[in-house]
Swiss-Prot record:
Compartment(s) of residence: Secreted
Active-site annotation: D166 (proton donor), D187 (nucleophile)
Protein source organism: Emericella nidulans (strain FGSC A4 / ATCC 38163 / CBS 112.46 / NRRL 194 / M139) (Aspergillus nidulans)
Similarity comment: family membership: Belongs to the pectinesterase family.
InterPro entries named in the record: Pectin_lyas_fold, Pectin_lyase_fold/virulence, Pectinesterase_Asp_AS, Pectinesterase_cat
Residue numbers binding substrate: Q143, R247, W249
Name this protein carries in UniProt: Pectinesterase A
PANTHER family according to UniProt: ACYL-COA THIOESTER HYDROLASE YBHC-RELATED, PECTINESTERASE 53-RELATED
Positions marked as site (Transition state stabilizer): Q165
Signal peptide feature range: 1-18
This enzyme's EC code(s): 3.1.1.11
Thermal profile of function: Optimum temperature is 30 degrees Celsius.
Amino acid sequence: MRVQSYLSLFSLVGAALCAPREHFKRTARTSAPAGCLTVGGSGTYSTIGAAFAALGSSSSEACIYISAGTYKEQLTFQYAGPLTLYGETTDTSSYKKNTVTITHTISSPEAGSLVASATVNAAMDNFTMYNINVVNGYGKGAQAVALAASGERQGYYGCQFLGYQDTLYARVGVQYYSNCYIEGAVDYIFGDASAWFGECDIVSNGAGYITAMSRETASDPAWYCFDHCNIYGKSGLDLTGDVYLGRPWRVLARVIYQNSELSDIINAAGWTTMAEGATPLYYEIGNTGDGADTSKRLYLSEISAAVTKATVLGSDWTDWLDWSY
C-alpha cells in the first residue's frame, strides 16, 4: 500500500509538471485542467503550500487547481519553471464569481519588510494566476501587502487584490493584469515593475493615492498603464475629490491612464507630490467620467497617443500573454 501511494503521488506530480498553461477562455472552471495538482474539495492536498512544495526542484511547466474555499496561508512562489494557479469559478472572464480566497493578516512593520508582509509573494518569472482573490486583512494603520509581484512575464486574470495601504506591490519585472479588481486607499498600486492593467476595476476604500510608482532612472523602461479601467470608490463611501491618481515614490515615476472611466473621487489636481525633487511623467488620454477633466491637473505631461502593450510589456508580449483575455 505504501509503495502504491508513492507511485500515485509521483504520477500526480509528474502530470502537473507536464501540463500546458491554459490559453483559451472557458465560461466555467469547476474541475482541474489536465495534469494539475489539486487543492481542497476532493483534491490531493488540503493547502496550497503543500501542493506547491510537492513540485520540488523541477523546472518543468506545472499547474495547481484550487477548489472553492478560504485558504488562510502566506505563500511564496519561487519555482524554476512556468507555474499557473487556477481558482474554481463559474465565470473565468471576470473576478465576480471567484470562489477561492487566500488571506493573511500582518503589517510590514510586524513582518520586517514590505515583501515579508505579502499574503502572496510571486518571486519568479512565468507566473500566472486565474480567478483567485488575495487579501491582506490588516486594514488601516500601516503598510500591508496582499500581492508582491517580482518577475518577468507574470499574468493575473480575473483576480482580486484587497488591502488598504500598499495592496499590490508590482515590484520588478513585467506584469499583465486583466479583468482584475484592485482595492485600497494609500499607494495601493506601487513599485517599479512595468505593468499593464487592462479592463480592471480600481477601487478606493478611503481617501488617498492610487499609485506610488518608483521608477528612478531615464533608462528604466517601466510604465504603469491603466487601459480601459474603471476608477471609482467603494460602495457606501463618499470620496468625492479625495483620491489622487498617483504620487511619485521615486523621482521619475511614469504612469498613464488611457481610455478609462474616472469617477468623481478623483481630485481636480489629479496628481500630487511625494519624493523630493521628483519630475514624474504623468499622462492622461482618452478618459471619460466626472474625474477626467484635466484643466486643473498638476504635474501632467503631454502625450499624443495611447501607449501600446509592446511599449509597456516588451516586444515579446504576444508570446506569453493569454490572448483570451
